[in-house]
Amino acid sequence: VHVHLDLPMFGTVSSDDHYTGTKAAAYGATTTVIDFVSQDSDELSACIRDLRQKADRRVAVDYGLHMNITHWTDAIGEQIPGLIDLGVSSIKVFTAYNDRLRLQDSDIFRVMRIAGEHGLLTMLHAENGDLIDLLVKEALSVGHTEPIWHARTRPAWGAVEAVMRGAAIAAEANAPLYIVHMNVAGEVDMLEYARSKGLVVVGETCPQYLFFTESDLEKVDAAKWICSPPLRKPEDNHRIWRGLKNGTIQVLATDHCPFYYDGTKPIA
């Protein structure tokens, strides 16, 4: 339910396209994947059409699509109800990546309100973009480019705050919410709290947040362990495991978005 195939990013493209990614899925007995449509224009139907034209002739399994909303205008809002007729019933918004993906809270509210009124599900990438930008700037100013600083500049508490903020916005919008790639113990606590207040909030995590920790970002080959959000501490892994076991977290996805390590498709 959460993959990124043939995704342009940081001057390169993810290494799995719609053929190789879905072929690998089939080998692993996965018969359906759900990819994301980038909002490359203000015509959402055109964004969906362009991706389908590229993917339809190459996929080896069934696939579905989520729609990223990364730029807001009233005209975009008017198009959201029509997404269902195009086979897209879920939208993703971001509270991070300030320079290219993040929506302001007021715009996230607008998206959620329309989605809730028309039976669409809003997915949320929950991190604190302002804190990340500041910490990255400070780290770079003193020369910290080691992989471990990917985790140190994306604070866990920022993710916890963003989950609670997203839940609060969803409550005000009277809309269901799906939190993607949860990786912090406090996020699970916030999910439980939101549910205790009657909110419809779904939690998702990924295998990397169950089996690996930020100590892997200090290995010789640490670049191989970079993912976003980053790997966390063992106590976070343990809480995520408990959340899966007791049903607080309902979805185990992959967030599959690989890049070649050997420089075949270098990241700028």
PLM regions: where:
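Short catalytic-loop micro-motif centered on adjacent basic/acidic residues
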Residues: 33-35, 64-67, 176-181
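Short, ordered loop/turn segments at secondary-structure junctions
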Residues: 4, 37-39, 68, 95-96, ...
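Alpha-helix-loop-beta-strand connector modules within alpha/beta enzyme cores
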Residues: 44-66, 109-124
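Histidine/acidic residue-rich metal-binding segments in metalloenzymes
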Residues: 75-252
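N-terminal small/glycine-rich loop or linker at the start of catalytic domains
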Residues: 1-8, 58-60, 212-225
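Active-site beta->alpha loop and helix N-cap motifs at the rims of alpha/beta catalytic domains
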Residues: 67-74
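Metal-associated gating/positioning segment near the N- to mid-region
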Residues: 1-58, 75
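Short acidic/polar active-site loop segments enriched in Thr and Asp
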Residues: 30-32, 61, 89, 250
